[in-house]
């Protein structure tokens, strides 16, 4: 049903297909259309938001043989475009700095820069996870950025710009990528599903989008996994995704919150342990609890808020969440949220993983009496 992984199969081939990074796309396309190409770009932002994709699009656009003056989109038909799309262009060099971080790797790169492009106008170097370069390697790269050959373009991509040396940052045009919104991810997934002729229920799609945490690549990878897990069973339901990812069911969280809000420590602890016996880890349960308590806190402040978690709920579940927000004092919500946030770290080091949660339950129930 699906031959290539979805995030590769549907990787944008034009700037107009890129979602969520309009500010970056507009600046780059203006520069390409006006032939104002910089020798070095720095793409910073969360994983899976399009940094490498835009680096490849830039490489295609500047080297496209059919692109006319004033245009910015690659044709995707000429020899240079096709080779980049297929991943076998001699003039697009991609380097993973996580595994090629030493000074010898950068020296090898510097030696390669001296040679003119084999077919294209520019030789484009994409250095992914650039913050992982060693100090010596970063300094060696800096010298190249200071005096680059006219045929070379560098695209440095990083998820942790604070680890980059300031002198490298200052020599690049910097673009900050943002996390994608839930609705942007859903729109993209719907387009893919339409082309793949696969049906997924809306709540299931919303859950996938919220679990991706702003990363379109993570969303597409998760969708791929869900399709494989579901087989021929369609439409794919929300429950399938919850089972696959080990997500705590909403009704389980709501029942636990009922005991917590009513200050029934005995029932809350008993329910917690019975739930964990079914295979959930304390970490999974605690994380889900934090997510829902945060949502209740935000609803207490503004009942009209539409956060990612809310979008994945049914109308009945939304009303239940609002009911918790309405009947629970804000001080109690804050107290519970703070305790379970502290518990998150304690679980990792506890010889009895659920013990920190049990202690938090007792403390919350006693304090709110």
Feature names for model-found ranges:
Residues 86-90, 108, 121, 173-174, ...:
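Extended, largely alpha-helical regulatory/partner-binding modules appended to the mid-to-C-terminal parts
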Residues 1-174, 184, 192:
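P-loop/Walker A NTP-binding region and its immediately flanking N-terminal helices
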């Amino acid at each position: 049903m699906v031959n290539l992984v979805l995030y590769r199969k549907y990787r944008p081939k034009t700037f107009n297909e890129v979602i969520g990074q309009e500010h970056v796309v507009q600046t780059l396309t203006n520069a390409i259309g006006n032939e104002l190409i910089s020798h070095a770009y720095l793409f910073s932002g969360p994983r899976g938001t399009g940094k490498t994709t835009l680096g490849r699009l830039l490489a295609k656009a500047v080297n496209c043989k059919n692109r006319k003056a004033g245009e910015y989109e690659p044709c995707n038909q000429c020899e240079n475009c096709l080779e980049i799309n297929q991943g076998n262009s001699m003039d697009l060099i991609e380097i993973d700095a996580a595994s090629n971080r030493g000074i010898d790797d950068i020296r090898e790169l510097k030696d390669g820069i001296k040679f003119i492009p084999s077919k294209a106008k520019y030789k484009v170097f994409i250095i992914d996870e650039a913050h992982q370069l060693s100090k010596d390697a970063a300094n060696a790269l800096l010298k190249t950025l200071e005096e680059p050959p006219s045929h070379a373009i560098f695209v440095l991509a990083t998820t942790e710009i604070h680890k980059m040396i300031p002198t490298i940052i200052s020599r690049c045009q910097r673009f900050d990528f943002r996390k994608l919104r839930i609705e942007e991810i859903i729109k993209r997934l719907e387009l893919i599903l339409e082309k793949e002729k696969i049906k997924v229920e809306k709540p299931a799609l919303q859950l996938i989008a919220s679990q991706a945490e702003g990363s379109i690549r993570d969303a597409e990878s998760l969708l791929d996994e869900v399709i494989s897990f579901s087989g021929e069973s369609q439409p794919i339901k929300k429950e399938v995704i919850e089972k696959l990812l080990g997500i705590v069911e909403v009704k389980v969280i709501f029942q636990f919150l009922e005991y917590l809000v009513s200050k029934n420590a005995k029932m809350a602890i008993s329910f917690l342990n019975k739930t964990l016996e079914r295979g959930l880890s304390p970490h999974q349960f605690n994380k889900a609890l934090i997510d829902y308590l945060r949502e209740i806190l935000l609803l207490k402040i503004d009942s009209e808020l539409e956060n990612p978690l809310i979008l994945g709920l049914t109308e009945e579940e939304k009303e239940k969440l609002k009911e918790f927000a309405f009947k629970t004092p804000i001080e109690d919500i804050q107290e519970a949220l703070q305790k379970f946030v502290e518990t998150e770290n304690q679980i990792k080091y506890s010889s009895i993983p659920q013990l920190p949660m049990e202690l938090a339950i007792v403390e919350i129930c006693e304090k709110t009496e």
